[in-house]
């Protein structure tokens, strides 16, 4: 392994631990729920992911699992079973370098009460949701670790791309969101905007006066000015 790759891997290990601690401290995950993976750059590829049943708030860089591009573990403690799903996301969304899964309270609550639509779990309430998040379809309930989730998510990514839309997140019924992006920072920004929009939507429903979505004209303006994927 080159010195450059070693330095990059060491940096990404620290980044995963920082992101996990931030998510834990802010209540996006609890106990041993949730997961984060990152894709290593370069021809060798590979991934870093926390060990199975790890608490994201207390990750240790040296214990993260290093898995090669073929899915074989090379070092660290036993990789989380979530990697199967994350690898499919990376395969079908090559622009992604990070995938985050949480059990965010507002989003899980939304699936328990009933999402806005199966194709869009929340309506486009704000311009930043349209610009930074975009469509978020619902994945039907499967038990944790079921391989059918990976197949379902891959199909959703592909069908949206065929329509000229970039998917950045899906919502697993009763479990939580899977969100991906070009970096841990970008991925967390999508997650935060999605959770906040779910909170706004549920609060408006609880008030008895649901907020109207942005108009089609307003969304078209966001497409024209910011290339919003909606």
Give the location of each predicted region.
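Glycine-rich flexible loops
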Residues: 1-230
